[in-house]
Swiss-Prot record:
The lineage of its organism: Archaea, Methanobacteriati, Methanobacteriota, Methanomada group, Methanococci. Homodimer. Adopts different quaternary structures in its active apo state compared with its inhibited 2-oxoglutarate-bound state. In the 2-oxoglutarate-bound state, NrpR is inhibited from binding to DNA because its DNA-binding domains are too far apart to recognize the operator DNA sequence. Keywords: DNA-binding, Repeat, Repressor, Transcription, Transcription regulation. InterPro entries: NRD, NrpR, NrpR_dom_sf, RNase_R_HTH_12, WH_DNA-bd_sf. Residues 85-320 are annotated as: NRD 1. This is Global nitrogen regulator NrpR. Residues 321-542 are annotated as: NRD 2. The keyword Hydrolase does not apply. Under nitrogen limitation, binding of the intracellular nitrogen metabolite 2-oxoglutarate to NrpR decreases the binding affinity of NrpR to DNA, leading to initiation of transcription. It comes from the Archaea.
Length: 542
């Protein structure tokens, strides 16, 4: 049996090369492209690697023309080698920024499929552009019968304009910006590009964190947006570019603080409309949508021109500071007072609200979830609040707090999706706690099923504390730790720093996933409250 988690970087690069070609590709071309990417191997070695990929059914030989990637190969490309893919979003941003050429009409687009009536799609798209909430005034709309294909300009095109004028913008993060009275006020949530294996704007849109239609209809809502910065010495040149800018996608810029994000010394921060903004209303209105950010480079003239009313740029500083999930976790640890010997104390819980009519069904589902060991411990809480039921599950940060009280410091690194099947156990997507304001498990909640994919966290512990960690864990006798790795060795595809051991924790939200899988509407908040452990009930007692 082939363990898919063992794919090395050369194999992944070959899959990536094949995925970007519409025609079969031969060993000679693959070897040439690999050399460009820093892998100095010849045609013979490439043919050997291709045979390995053929054996895994990730590629297929097409006569003498070469190889094509299979559907299984495309799926594997999206999952394999998570440590390598962690920087893929940032790498793709740089590649597309450099490869585009707005001056000569070559632009980066996002490609999306909306399963809806063409006229309905056109009406919504026009309303977004007329309100000024799009990058540029060009869009591609094609009726494919079963779906409508939409191609929108990516905000990277503005970065390309800056680059052509000698300004190199450093891409920091993407998020959602709160609007009041039709103007941007502050970033509500963010994810750093370098801290994620998934596209941040796609994640926020699919999680329904946006409200673009609210901005259009009454001036209040949440906009998908990107954030960059560059050296303050370029400010005058930047403002000259704005005077002739055709894309009209800047919503705010300034020094020190821009919409709640610290810029730092001698820098100018810039917030831009996300290129996926015209797509967000379809997700907000529950249309079936497939999103492919930064998909390709096309001729600008191939896109249709729409009426667009540009909005004013805001330069007012915000009075707030965005807190990362890691900062929230460290503060939450301090609130944990659980004593192992007394089997009681304060713990951190996630909360979820459901309609009271689902109470009996939810009880049965949660009991089954805890029987399967999906909870951090065997306890959860049920609280009636008017016509709603509040469900409380112990959060994994409680484990961090308990271990810290026993002089074992765990360092939270990532939250993500852990895939567990017969032939592989690996993380397939992650977000760094220090690079996101949202708990990663809130982002990934709708992408797991608790059958093959689970919410899980990744921590590090120094090798000298590993033995004590195991002692405390044995004494605690909870389910929360999935695995502890060897010093200096990767665990489930994630590497560690020198002399550190990986620690994989199961997500405290996993029991709630089963409610979602059984189509019970749920309102979720991770790491939300402090409760007494004794106030929670064991599933065995209910």
């Amino acid at each position: 049996m082939i363990i898919m988690a063992d794919l090395d970087r050369k194999l992944i690069e070959i899959l990536d090369i094949l995925s970007k070609s519409k025609e079969p590709v031969g060993a000679k071309i693959i070897a040439k492209e690999l050399n460009k990417r820093g892998y100095k191997i010849g045609e013979r070695a490439v043919r050997y690697h291709l045979k390995l990929l053929d054996g895994m059914k990730l590629t297929k030989k097409v006569g003498y023309a070469g190889r094509v990637i299979t559907e299984r190969g495309l799926e594997e490309l999206e999952k394999a080698n998570i440590s390598y893919r962690l920087g893929s979003i940032y790498s793709n941003i740089l590649e597309k920024t450099i490869s585009a050429n707005y001056r000569f009409g070559y632009v980066v687009i996002n490609r999306c499929q909306v399963y809806a009536d063409f006229n309905d799609v056109l009406k919504i798209i026009k309303s977004v552009y007329e309100s000024g909430l799009a990058v540029g005034d060009r869009v591609g709309i094609i009726d494919r019968e079963k779906f409508v294909e939409i191609n929108t300009l990516c905000s990277l095109n503005f970065d390309n304009i800056l680059l052509q004028n000698g300004i190199f913008p450093l891409h920091v993060c993407a998020g959602v910006v709160k609007y009041e009275d039709g103007k941007p006020v502050e970033f509500k949530e963010i994810i750093d590009y370098k801290s994620t294996s998934i596209d941040p704007l796609r994640a926020f849109i699919e999680k329904k964190e946006t409200d673009v239609m609210g901005i259009i209809e009454n001036g209040e809502g949440y906009l998908p947006a990107n954030f960059r910065y560059f050296g303050v010495e370029f400010l005058e040149r930047f403002e000259t570019i704005l005077e002739i800018d055709e894309l009209k996608c800047i919503i705010s810029y300034g020094t020190e603080n821009v919409l709640g994000l610290d810029v730092g010394d001698d820098k100018v921060g810039v917030a831009l409309i996300g290129g996926l903004t015209p797509i967000a209303p379809f997700v907000e209105n529950n249309y079936c949508v497939e999103i492919c950010p930064m998909s390709s480079i096309v001729r600008l003239e191939s896109l249709h021109k729409l009426k667009k009313n540009p909005r004013d740029i805001v330069t007012k500083k915000a009075n707030i500071r965005i807190k990362t999930a890691l900062s929230k976790m460290f503060n939450a640890m301090a609130k944990v007072t659980y004593d192992i010997d007394e089997a009681d104390g304060d713990v951190i819980v996630n909360t979820a609200f459901i309609d009271k009519k689902y109470l009996d069904e939810a009880f049965d589902i949660l009991k089954e979830a805890y029987k399967k060991g999906l909870g951090i411990s065997d306890r959860f809480g049920i609280v009636e609040e008017n016509d709603r039921i509040k469900i409380q599950t112990i959060c994994a940060v409680t484990l961090d707090g308990i271990f810290l009280r026993n002089s074992v410091p765990l360092i939270p690194k990532y939250g993500g999706i852990l895939e567990i099947t017969e032939d592989k156990e690996r993380f397939i997507d992650i977000i760094g706690y220090d690079g996101s304001s949202l708990d990663p498990h809130e982002v990934f909640f709708n992408f797991v099923d608790c059958e093959k994919t689970f919410l899980a966290g990744f921590r590090e512990v120094h090798r000298v504390a590993r033995e004590k960690l195991e002692e405390v864990l044995k004494k605690l006798n909870w389910n929360g730790i999935k695995a502890i790795g060897e010093p200096n060795n990767e665990l489930y595809g994630i590497g560690v720093n020198k002399d550190m051991c990986g620690v994989v924790t199961m997500g405290g939200i996993n029991p709630l996933v089963l409610l979602k899988e059984n189509e019970i509407p749920i309102e979720l908040k991770a790491m939300h409250e402090v409760v007494r452990f004794s106030d929670l009930k064991s599933y065995k007692e209910i």
